[in-house]
Amino acid sequence: MNLNATILGQAIAFVLFVLFCMKYVWPPIMAAIEKRQKEIADGLSSAERAKKDLELAQSNATDQLKKAKAEAQVIIEQANKRRAQILDEAKAEAEQERNKIVAQAQAEIEAERKRAREELRKQVAILAVAGAEKIIERSVDEAANSDIVNKLVAEL
């Protein structure tokens, strides 16, 4: 094998080139690669955290939705109970009002009946007195007439 100066010069130039690259070119490239690897790793970990946060948020949203539905159901049940209570109170109040009106009407009917009876008694008494006067005019026997008048008054 023949080693000449050209090959030796090329070998020295190659070694110098490699040393130059290792000293000045390789560190910035490695730094850029490491920086990019770190950014990718950070991005992946950030994506993992975001995924976990999303799952947690979805879980929380589901829980809150369930709680809201339960609270809404409780509120609806309370509203239905209150509605039933109000209806019962209104029915009871209406029943009391009806009973009051019926009692008042019956009292008015009874008062009107008493007034009519009293008016009728007065008219019968007037007629009895008029009849007694006619009887007295026709007959002289006062004792018999007074018995008749007393019987009429007793019947009234």
From Swiss-Prot:
F-type ATPases have 2 components, F(1) - the catalytic core - and F(0) - the membrane proton channel. F(1) has five subunits: alpha(3), beta(3), gamma(1), delta(1), epsilon(1). F(0) has three main subunits: a(1), b(2) and c(10-14). The alpha and beta chains form an alternating ring which encloses part of the gamma chain. F(1) is attached to F(0) by a central stalk formed by the gamma and epsilon chains, while a peripheral stalk is formed by the delta and b chains. Coiled coil: none annotated. Keywords: ATP synthesis, Cell inner membrane, Cell membrane, CF(0), Hydrogen ion transport, Ion transport, Membrane, Transmembrane, Transmembrane helix, Transport. The keyword Iron does not apply. HAMAP family: ATP_synth_b_bprime. The lineage of its organism: Bacteria, Pseudomonadati, Pseudomonadota, Gammaproteobacteria, Enterobacterales. Disulfide bonds: none annotated. One of its GO terms (molecular function) is proton-transporting ATPase activity, rotational mechanism. F(1)F(0) ATP synthase produces ATP from ADP in the presence of a proton or sodium gradient. F-type ATPases consist of two structural domains, F(1) containing the extramembraneous catalytic core and F(0) containing the membrane proton channel, linked together by a central stalk and a peripheral stalk. During catalysis, ATP synthesis in the catalytic domain of F(1) is coupled via a rotary mechanism of the central stalk subunits to proton translocation. Component of the F(0) channel, it forms part of the peripheral stalk, linking F(1) to F(0). The chain crosses the membrane at residues 11-31. The gene is atpF. GO terms for cellular component: plasma membrane; proton-transporting ATP synthase complex. Belongs to the ATPase B chain family. This is ATP synthase subunit b. CDD domains: ATP-synt_Fo_b (cd06503).
